[in-house]
């Protein structure tokens, strides 16, 4: 393998889970053996200058599988003398597969995330997914939920070539400090955050996510009157920003729990470990919307929370249950059930010993299965077309 060109619409400095995933994969590849072709975005010049690999920016903020994009991708492949292409998302740029084969690519890999499940549910889009699957060597999937749905629309040959590849977690960045309230060092540490936000001494449930309907922050707020009836001092910390924010604030006021709900707004990625560590329990009761077209891909936040030593409560949407060992690292709940959510939150806040045991189990699981070092081995095997044999932890 001479090198890999990553062709993707999803790449920083644009924010999002897919963007972080694709960037993480790029950083796993050896310098000199990877380049990225991605759309223009505000702040891209400064971001690109800090990367250990070249980033070729498309002049527009969106790339479609049209001839001009195909020509630029082919030119980048030839310029770097690479023979492998990794599509950051199978749909729609995977349709460029035949063009890049003709440009010299001998191996094509297409990642899938969550939106492809929506494509699989639409008659017109199914045919495009099938074409993509037939034109690449490997289609990856996050977990069993998405594998089963994509396999139905791919050809038998393409379905047989599917391989699991999910995001990793920087466990060292999120690992708990020497005491439950210590958190990472520095001004963004848990104790400082609790003090600054008026949470010191209170039981805290934290949710780190964009404020959008699918993530279920509204269900958390609706559960809070019941939670407070069991744990009177319980506080809810909502970390992130998004279009649903004003509605959520009105909901908290209308339910009389605005004094118990703290909205942080957008938080720099480097400070997130401290916000996770400021919580006693992590909860994001995500739910499926739009008849199955809007589902959770994986929910990397559950794994980050586990790496921070927190018990997690997640919704049953899409691949979210793949990021939780139900009953061991936390609980999977019906994403729309206020009652079940309130019961699980209240039970964990009322039993710190159980919560901490689940947090320890989650940290051990993430270290064993989800560390980026594990992802690196899988990625290398997928790009080379070889078998992956994981090294046992500690070996």
Which stretches of residues belong to each language-model region?
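Short His-centered aromatic/hydrophobic patch
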Residues: 87-93
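Carbohydrate-associated surface elements
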Residues: 145, 168
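Conserved donor-binding/catalytic core segment of Leloir-type glycosyltransferases
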Residues: 188, 194, 199-215, 221-224, ...
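A short, well-ordered alpha-helix in the C-terminal region of glycosyltransferases
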Residues: 233, 260, 340, 347, ...
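Acidic donor-binding loop of glycosyltransferase active sites
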Residues: 260, 266, 277-295, 310
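Short hydrophobic beta-strand element within catalytic cores of glycosyltransferases
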Residues: 283, 302, 307, 311-314, ...
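Conserved acidic donor-binding segment of nucleotide-sugar-dependent glycosyltransferases
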Residues: 325-327, 331-338, 347-353
């Amino acid at each position: 393998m001479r090198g890999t060109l990553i062709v993707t619409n999803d790449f920083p400095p644009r924010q999002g889970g897919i963007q972080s995933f694709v960037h993480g994969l790029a950083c796993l590849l050896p310098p000199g053996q990877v380049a990225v072709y991605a759309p223009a975005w505000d702040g891209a010049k400064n971001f690109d200058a800090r990367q250990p690999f070249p980033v070729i920016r498309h002049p527009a903020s969106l790339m479609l599988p049209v001839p001009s994009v195909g020509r630029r991708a082919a030119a980048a492949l030839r310029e770097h003398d690479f023979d492998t292409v990794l599509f950051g998302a199978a749909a729609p740029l995977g349709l460029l597969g035949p063009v890049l084969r003709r440009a010299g690519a001998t191996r094509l890999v297409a990642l899938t995330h969550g939106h492809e499940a929506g494509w699989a549910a639409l008659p017109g889009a199914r045919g495009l997914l099938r074409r993509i699957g037939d034109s690449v060597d490997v289609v990856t999937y996050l977990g069993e939920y998405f594998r089963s749905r994509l396999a139905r629309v791919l050809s038998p040959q393409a379905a047989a070539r599917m391989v699991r590849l999910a995001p990793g977690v920087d466990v060292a960045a999120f690992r708990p400090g020497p005491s439950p309230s210590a958190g990472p060092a520095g001004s963004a540490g848990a104790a400082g955050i609790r003090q600054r936000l008026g949470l010191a001494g209170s039981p805290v449930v934290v949710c780190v996510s964009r404020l959008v309907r699918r993530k279920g922050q509204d269900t958390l707020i609706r559960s809070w009157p019941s939670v407070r009836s069991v744990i009177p001092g319980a506080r809810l910390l909502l970390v992130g920003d998004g279009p649903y924010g004003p509605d959520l604030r009105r909901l908290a006021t209308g339910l009389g729990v605005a004094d118990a709900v703290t909205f942080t707004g957008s938080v720099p990625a480097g400070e997130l470990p401290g916000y996770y560590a400021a919580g006693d329990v992590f909860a994001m009761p995500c739910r499926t919307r739009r008849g199955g077209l809007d589902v959770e891909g994986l929910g990397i936040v559950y794994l980050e929370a586990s790496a921070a030593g927190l018990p997690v409560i997640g919704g049953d949407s899409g691949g979210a249950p793949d990021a939780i060992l139900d009953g061991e690292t936390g609980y999977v709940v019906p994403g729309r059930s206020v009652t079940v959510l309130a019961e699980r939150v209240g039970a964990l806040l009322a039993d710190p010993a159980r919560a901490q045991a689940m947090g320890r189990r989650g940290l051990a699981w993430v270290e064993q299965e989800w560390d980026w070092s594990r992802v690196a081995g899988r990625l290398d095997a997928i790009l080379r077309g070889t078998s992956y044999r994981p090294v046992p932890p500690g070996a």
